[in-house]
């Protein structure tokens, strides 16, 4: 270590600090020339390598100025020195020293250069001091001129930008950025006013004004587009643009003009399109026609699609208006919320102005609702009345009514209007159509009735008119038909308006495919009874048991007292069924014909039309009543009219029924079809409202005794009329609900005087069967051959009683045969039996009245015969009491009355004819009445008969 230190001392090694201190002062330095400096700068060095060497120097060497480098290096030497390691370490230190010295040299060169620059600066400063006074004023002048030129350049650039603004404005208009275009134009006008001292600005101002007017025109066009297809973003831009222009109220006035024009243009284009499409290549210039004249060129085939498209197009216009109002309501609410949140006094004036504009817009929009709807009504009215719809198909006309009804619903939701214009126009068309339609249907009904064979139409026992397609519309309207689970949903759906439902898409006037084809009417049965074999056997057994001879009954009872066979039914069970409703009356299908079903369907169609268009309810109900009237009149004419039996005076046809039939004949039946057609116009018009009387089909035979003179056909006809009356009774609440209050007396009269008389038609219809089914004339002949002036009381009844009972047994057999073809309701069976028994009893009285001589024993024989007849008859029928039983008994017993009692009896019993009373008095002569008394009694009879003459 001592060797190394001494070696370093001898070599005169110094620290870098000492080397720096020994540098000569700057004054003694020789300034290098520019060439030397350039050469020193251009010497190639590797900065990266140099930096790596410097970085390898330990930081301890630079820690402080008092650091002893020699001591530090000596202390780092290892205890055992190696010459090779020392040399390597020395070389490393040399590299580090060389690198550091190079930096020092570089710093020295930099300092020398700085000294040269400073010297040059001092020299130039001295020169500047000498020249500053001469050039300073010139410099300031140039600077001022420069500033002025910069300002001029800025103005020229602004003017240039203003000149080129029209390009940007055109782009913004193409982009439909109307607020931005107006704002830019207004800013340009404001900027142009700043440079009005330039001569080119006046031309620019004129150009900007023209541009602003052009923007307003395009803005008006954009506003008109709202009328057919409302777009929120588009309308928001338009309103913002008008607000920038300060023309909010003007915009609203223009908007209503555009809506009015849109309605006119829309309907004209729709109708024109269909007219040109149907006209083909004709040369007619339809574009020049007025809308009213154009509507008359619509063909029947294109009428419905054109109407649908017309309503769809008008819906779009009204929907746009609705959405416009909705936009303003939402916008006003947003603005009100904004104003309430910002309470700045400086904006009070602007707020009041905006409030006034909003109030004006709101009133204008509300007033415009009725105006627009009125325009829509007038356009649709013109279209409706432009074509005669009287020859349209029913479904097509119902579709027209449905569309107009939907349109009126739109009007009510749109502005609360009752659509009087539409109602009146569609009422005219409906009445006109319905008269033609009803006239055709009446002619069809006459044709059906004249071709009707009165066969049973097999429908199911569960048949209900609501199952028919024509009455489907009633199912939705009846609350009981809606299940409780569906009621909340339906209630919610009813609160949603059409505008809310179709606000975001769709159209309420889209033609829906008729779903009727997808539905099936499950009303027809494979047979008329739709019952199982047990029910059929019970029904047939009942038929055969209800009115059979006593022998068959006795066998039947005997069977029941023994072992009952399988599927047998007790007589008590059958009788209880009979008392309830003639066996399967309730469980079986109703009795009706194809014609009846057609009338019911027709009534459904009439009600469907009435439901859609309530203003013509009275006309529809009046025509419905004519359908029932004609059906009733036809049944009476075919099966109930018989002047011979009407003259019996038994009151078969009630006064109400006769009044009804006379009214129908006078108001509905054309009795002059075969007469000379020449006559007054008034008579011809009246006859147009009438229908010829129907004629019974030649296929229906009413003269055959084996079929009980067409009893099956009579039952089907009469009971189908009763069924039809029941359906009218069922529909009465629905008809009453739509009938105008002023016309309700007509409906009440129709039900009380016409519908309720259907049951009364049974008597005259079945009376004819009862009058022909039993040979009453033969019974009179047999009674005439009986000797009544016998002297002893007889114990055996006369043969005419057995003959009459055989007639009843034969009647029962035929009735049973008929019941196999057609179910005979209990009430019909009872009426037939009542008629037969009443006629038989009256025939007995007639026979007794023909007796010339009769003794007391003969009267007793009459009582014996009648009691025998009653006893046997009561076994054939369950009807109690026997009709006209007292009529016979009273007449027989009157023989025994004294003079005074008989006179009183004659005055009290006016149900007997003059012949009956006269014969009674004559037979009693010589027995207990003398001639004087006879004259007195005959005079009393004459007094009673005189008012009848």
From Swiss-Prot:
Residues 569-581 have a biased composition (Basic and acidic residues). GO terms for molecular function: SNARE binding. Disulfide bonds: none annotated. Keywords: Coiled coil, Endosome, Membrane, Protein transport, Transport. One of its GO terms (biological process) is protein transport. GO terms for cellular component: EARP complex; membrane; recycling endosome. It is found in: Recycling endosome; Membrane. Residues 1-28, 509-581 are annotated as: Disordered. Its main location: other. Pfam families: Syndetin_C, Vps54_N. Residues 82-104, 198-226 form a coiled coil. Residues 8-18 have a biased composition (Polar residues). InterPro entries: Syndetin_C, VPS50, VPS54_N. It comes from the Eukaryota. Belongs to the syndetin family. Component of the endosome-associated retrograde protein (EARP) complex. Acts as a component of the EARP complex that is involved in endocytic recycling. The EARP complex associates with Rab4-positive endosomes and promotes recycling of internalized transferrin receptor (TFRC) to the plasma membrane. This is Syndetin. It comes from Gallus gallus. The gene is VPS50.
């Amino acid at each position: 270590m001592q060797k190394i230190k001494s070696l370093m001392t001898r070599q005169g090694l110094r620290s870098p600090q000492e080397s720096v201190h020994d540098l000569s002062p700057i004054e003694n330095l020789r300034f290098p020339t520019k060439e030397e400096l350039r050469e020193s700068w251009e010497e190639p060095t590797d900065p990266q390598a140099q930096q790596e060497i410097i970085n390898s120097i330990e930081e301890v060497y630079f820690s402080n100025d008092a650091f002893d480098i020699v001591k530090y290096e000596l202390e780092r030497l290892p205890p055992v020195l190696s010459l090779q390691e020392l040399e390597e370490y020395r070389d490393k230190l040399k590299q580090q020293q060389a690198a550091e010295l190079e930096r020092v040299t570089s710093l020295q060169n930099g300092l020398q250069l700085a000294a040269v620059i400073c010297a040059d600066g001092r020299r130039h400063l001295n020169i500047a001091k000498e020249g500053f006074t001469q050039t300073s004023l010139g410099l300031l002048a140039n600077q001022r001129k420069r500033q002025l030129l910069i300002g001029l350049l800025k103005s020229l650039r602004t003017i240039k930008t203003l000149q080129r603004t029209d390009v940007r404005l055109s782009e913004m208009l193409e982009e439909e950025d109307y607020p931005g275009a107006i704002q830019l134009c207004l800013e340009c006008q404001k900027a142009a006013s700043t440079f009005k001292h330039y001569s080119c600005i006046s031309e620019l101002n004129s150009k900007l004004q023209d541009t602003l007017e052009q923007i307003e025109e395009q803005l008006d066009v954009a506003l008109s587009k709202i009328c057919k297809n409302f777009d929120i973003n588009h309308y928001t831009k338009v309103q913002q643009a008008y607000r920038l222009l300060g023309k909010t109220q003007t915009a609203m006035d223009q908007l209503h003009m555009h809506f009015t024009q849109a309605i006119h243009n829309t309907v004209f284009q729709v109708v024109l399109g269909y007219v040109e499409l149907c006209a083909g290549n004709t040369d007619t210039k339809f574009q020049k026609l007025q809308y009213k004249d154009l509507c008359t060129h619509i063909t029947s085939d294109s009428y419905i699609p054109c109407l649908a498209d017309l309503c769809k197009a008008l819906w779009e216009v009204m929907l746009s208006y609705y959405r416009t109002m909705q936009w303003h309501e939402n916008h006003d609410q947003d603005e009100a919320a904004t104003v309430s949140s910002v309470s700045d006094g400086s904006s009070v004036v602007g707020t009041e102005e905006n409030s006034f504009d909003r109030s004006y817009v709101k009133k204008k929009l509300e007033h415009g609702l009725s105006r627009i709807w009125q325009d829509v009504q007038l356009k649709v009215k013109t279209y409706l009345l432009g074509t005669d719809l009287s020859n349209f198909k029913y479904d097509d006309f119902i579709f027209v009514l449905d569309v107009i009804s939907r349109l009126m619903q739109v009007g009510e939701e749109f502005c609360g209007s009752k659509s009087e214009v539409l109602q009146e126009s569609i009422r005219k068309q409906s009445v006109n159509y319905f008269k033609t339609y009803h006239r055709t249907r009446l002619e069809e009904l006459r044709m059906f009735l004249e071709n009707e064979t009165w066969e049973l139409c097999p429908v199911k026992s569960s048949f209900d008119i609501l199952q028919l397609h024509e009455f489907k519309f009633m199912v939705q309207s009846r609350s009981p038909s809606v299940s409780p689970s569906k009621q909340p949903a339906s209630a919610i759906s009813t609160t949603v308006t059409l505008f809310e439902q179709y606000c975001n898409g769709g159209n309420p006037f889209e033609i829906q495919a008729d779903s009727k084809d997808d539905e099936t009417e499950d009303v027809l049965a494979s047979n008329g009874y739709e019952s199982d074999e047990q029910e059929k056997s019970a029904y047939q057994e009942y038929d055969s048991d209800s009115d059979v001879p006593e022998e068959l009954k006795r066998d039947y009872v005997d069977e029941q007292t023994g072992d009952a066979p399988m599927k047998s039914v007790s007589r008590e069970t059958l009788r209880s069924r009979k008392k309830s409703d003639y066996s399967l009356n309730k469980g079986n299908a109703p009795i009706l014909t194809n014609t009846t079903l057609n009338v019911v369907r027709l009534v459904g169609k009439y009600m469907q039309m009435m439901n859609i268009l309530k203003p013509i309810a009275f006309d529809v109900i009046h025509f419905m009543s004519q359908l029932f009237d004609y059906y009733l009149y036809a049944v009476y004419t075919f099966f109930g009219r018989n002047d011979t039996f009407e003259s019996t005076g038994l009151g078969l046809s009630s006064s109400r029924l006769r009044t009804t039939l006379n009214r129908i004949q006078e108001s509905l039946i054309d009795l002059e079809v075969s007469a000379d057609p020449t006559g007054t116009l008034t008579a011809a018009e009246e006859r147009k409202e009438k229908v010829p009387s129907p004629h019974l089909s030649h296929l229906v035979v009413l003269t055959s005794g084996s079929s009980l003179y067409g009893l099956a056909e009579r039952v089907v006809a009469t009971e189908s009329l009763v069924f039809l009356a029941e359906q009218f009774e069922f529909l009465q609440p629905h008809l009453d609900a739509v009938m105008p209050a002023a016309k309700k007396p007509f409906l009440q009269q129709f039900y009380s005087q016409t519908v309720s008389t259907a049951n009364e038609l049974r008597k005259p219809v079945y009376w004819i069967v009862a009058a022909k089914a039993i040979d009453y004339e033969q019974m009179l002949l047999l009674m005439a051959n009986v000797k009544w002036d016998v002297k002893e009381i007889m114990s055996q009844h006369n043969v005419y009683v057995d003959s009459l009972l055989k007639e009843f047994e034969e009647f029962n057999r035929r009735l049973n045969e008929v019941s196999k073809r057609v179910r005979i309701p209990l009430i019909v069976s009872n009426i037939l039996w009542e008629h037969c028994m009443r006629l038989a009893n009256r025939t007995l009285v007639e026979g007794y009245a023909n007796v010339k001589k009769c003794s007391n024993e003969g009267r007793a024989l009459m009582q014996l015969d009648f009691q025998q007849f009653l006893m046997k008859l009561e076994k054939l029928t369950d009807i109690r009491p026997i009709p006209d039983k007292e009529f016979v008994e009273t007449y027989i017993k009157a023989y025994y009355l004294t003079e005074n009692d008989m006179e009183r009896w004659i005055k009290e019993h006016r149900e007997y004819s003059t012949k009956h009373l006269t014969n009674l008095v004559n037979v009693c002569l010589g027995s207990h009445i003398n001639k004087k008394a006879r004259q007195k009694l005959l005079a009393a009879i004459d007094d009673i008969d005189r008012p009848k003459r």
